[in-house]
Amino acid sequence: MRIPFLLIIFLPFSLPLFSTLKPKNIIVLANSNETDSKALAHFYCQHRGVPTNNIVFLSTSSKETISWDEFVSTILIPLRESVIKQGLIKVIRKEPSDAQGKRPYQIINDSIKAICVCKGIPLRIKSYLEKVSALEAEYAKKIPEKLRKNEAAVDSELAILLIKNTPRAGFISNPFFKNQNSKDKNYEKKYLAVTRIDAPSYQNAQRMITDSIATEKKGLIGRAYIDNGGPHQKGNQWLKQIRDQLYEIDFDFSVENSRRLFQQNDRFDAPILYFGWYAGDYSGVFRNHRFRFPPGAIAFHIHSFSASTVRNPKKQWVGPLLEMGASVTLGNVFEPYLEFSHHPHLFMKKLIEGCSLAEAHLYSIPVFSWQSIALGDPLYRPFAKDLDQQWADRDLIETNSYLLLRKIQKTLNEKNYNEAIDLANSHFFEHPSLALGLKRAQIYYELEKPNMALNAIQFARHLSLYTTLEMGLGNEIAQLAYKWGDFSLALGIYNNLFQQEALTNEMAKAWLPEGISLASRLNHFDLSDKWRRKLALLKK
């Protein structure tokens, strides 16, 4: 941040900070003018064991976008004063004051490591166009013209809450970015990991907390999806690295490499992880009004203005993803330029290592006093339990078919194909599911046993009910049946899909031509005529 203030001298401190992050190390920030904001702060402290003395209430604007004057007078200065007054940061006050009447402080205790910003605190600071000081003007000359911006994310400014004499234009490098050993080489500065619990509704903000806590107990279970068709090689490479990371931890995943995003007719079951770019507004599969993420999901879509609002559930990406049930997301309030936004593969690297959201955020963001934010519980550790621990507790987990998929994937990655099919077979007859049935068929096909592969998907003939997120999975099985020559099975699956309440117009428009072709091929002209009429209505 960007105005000269109190002289602060930091004593050296040791790291890692966040591998030992405790509830007592977190400031919880709320808007005293917002009932929901105050309630959320208490809710978080109650559920995470944060001392209530760590709550700081600020009387600030209820708007998402504020001016620099509002930020300084209603957030920055009151927050500094409050953390000292409440004993959250201990200081030695020195006399006399400087020429501006500001007292220099010496920090003697640095127990606070993170800030949890609650719904109700402003989101971003608009551009400051008035005349700047000579010091700031001189600084601005030293940075590229495109970076001489002073609009910013509130959270990114709070990360440098205790650093003096920072300019408004441009950004400040984050010394913890990619720091393999988490060694702070710049002892005169102290940075805070700032994450935000915010969503379009208070109920969803609460859910972000409770889902995170519940997911930590059982671990992440589901599949991953990557939309990797963005406009720049660097972003595509980042997401490719995430794909490689998922392979290393035996996660089942799907990748869309074209410019199109995953659509409603694509497979998208159990999306516990989603990474994508580069669309300006949420679209594709996320336009299905029935769509919901599983509890604890991590989902983000790289875009310059993905977090220009959090409160609107129908605009950009952050608000809609949280409204649809995500527990963690990343975003940008203004244009950050790609290289200065979160590096998602680094973010995932830390999470996979078992670190908290706070640590992953700090590790993966190259700069502060800029545009990027992280939303979620700072203490959330989605990979706190590894696969072996999850497998040991599998009988206690309701969604264990997707846990089984990961166990099978681990066996396949180790080239133990026979063991993988034995594992799939032994559990399928006890806990049948579309996902597991498809996996059995795919393994048989890889083992060059096409008849057994085809036999493995025959169960789909008898299914009569599909959930919203199973519809695309059903289509994938129908396509395999067609590919492997069982046209009757493929037609039967499509006939079932077309009768589902979960069928959307987008699904129908994508699948009806295939169904019509199959019905005609098998002389079911009543069906083909019926579906032609339906398709014609949809195209009007």
Language-model region placement:
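Generic helix N-cap/helix-start motif at coil->alpha-helix transitions
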Residues: 397-404, 431-438, 467-475, 504-512, ...
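Structured catalytic cores of large enzymes
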Residues: 64-240, 245, 369-383
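Caspase-like cysteine protease fold
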Residues: 353-415
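C-terminal soluble interaction/assembly domains
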Residues: 291-364
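Solenoid-like repeat scaffolds
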Residues: 425-431, 459-467, 496-504, 534-540
